[in-house]
């Protein structure tokens, strides 16, 4: 071997370059994603489009599904111009039958589905507990929660059928880990998405389907304008109060000051390579989470001191 390079060292160097070379600042195994297909709801803009671009850069086929046809067409052309194999399909995530159609079209175009990114979501109504109305709650539940349920229900069998494994990526929020006052519906649905994701990890492990949940804080998207896609059946006859409008305006300003959406897609790819379950985009929120976990730990400690629970302290935990 020239320059004193041993055969073993050369092999190790080759493996290192294959599995850890730099691509857009991230470590990438090209074979992990290349030629496979991802279905992304809410893929026409914002976080969904950012993820579509990042996966496209890894040579994946992408199916972008969105309720906004105009944005969908624009996003499709943008991805095509970047050399990404793309299929654009209109989708209302709250309708299971439309998810079925997306799955059918994805399989017809690309043959197999390997990943679903349940990204589509709405900000929901803002306001006090007593001011929230049923239609507003139903809108947020149907899109943010049932949209994820339907996406996984339809796409999981398609991922299982080829036996190659795959991914489910659910987009939640830091709000799901620590509640936002006056945004009860949004907070509740994002907490539910995190819990669902935690449930699915153990269920799908045997099928080599990796589950992740993305929990961003404020990102520069148009989630504050999600009202534009609110169908008639979810619209309320009750006018928004001035204080509710003020809360919505404040939230909008926070979103506009958020991080660049392009970072999020790249971060998702980085996290999937490392098989991360919780995917965070705002490490500066760690201290807030530590406050919560400390409070939980303290509550457990107090329960251990309760005379009512003394016989339970040493009981073994039985899992199903």
Where does each model-flagged region fall?
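Active-site helix of classical SDR
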Residues: 152, 189
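SDR active-site lid
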Residues: 206-279
């Amino acid at each position: 071997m020239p320059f004193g390079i041993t055969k073993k060292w050369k092999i190790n160097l080759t493996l290192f370059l294959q599995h850890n070379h730099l691509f857009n600042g991230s470590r990438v195994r090209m074979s992990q994603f290349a030629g496979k297909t991802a279905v992304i709801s809410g893929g026409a803009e914002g976080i969904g489009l950012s993820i579509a671009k990042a996966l496209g850069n890894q040579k994946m086929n992408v199916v972008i599904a969105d309720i906004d046809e105009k944005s969908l067409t624009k996003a499709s052309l943008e991805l095509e111009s970047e050399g990404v194999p793309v299929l654009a399909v209109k989708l209302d995530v709250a309708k299971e039958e439309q998810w079925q159609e997306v799955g059918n079209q994805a399989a017809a175009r690309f043959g197999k589905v390997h990943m679903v990114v349940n990204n589509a979501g709405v900000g929901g109504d803002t306001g006090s507990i007593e001011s929230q109305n049923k239609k507003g709650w139903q809108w947020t539940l149907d899109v943010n929660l049932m949209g994820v349920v339907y996406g996984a229900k339809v796409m999981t069998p398609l991922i299982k059928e080829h036996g190659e494994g795959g991914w489910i990526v659910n987009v939640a929020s830091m709000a799901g880990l620590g509640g936002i006052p006056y945004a009860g519906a949004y907070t509740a649905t994002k907490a539910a998405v995190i819990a669902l994701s935690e449930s699915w990890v153990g269920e799908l492990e045997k099928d080599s389907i990796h589950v992740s949940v993305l929990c961003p804080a404020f990102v520069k998207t148009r989630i504050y304008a999600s009202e534009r896609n609110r169908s008639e059946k979810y619209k309320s006859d009750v006018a928004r109060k001035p204080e509710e409008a003020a809360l919505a305006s404040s939230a909008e300003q926070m979103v506009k000051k958020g991080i660049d959406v392009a970072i999020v897609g790249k971060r998702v790819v980085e996290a999937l390579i490392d098989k991360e379950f919780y995917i965070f985009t705002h490490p500066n929120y760690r201290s807030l989470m530590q406050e919560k976990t400390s409070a939980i730990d303290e509550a457990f400690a107090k329960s251990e001191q309760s005379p009512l629970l003394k016989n339970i302290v040493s009981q073994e935990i039985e899992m199903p």
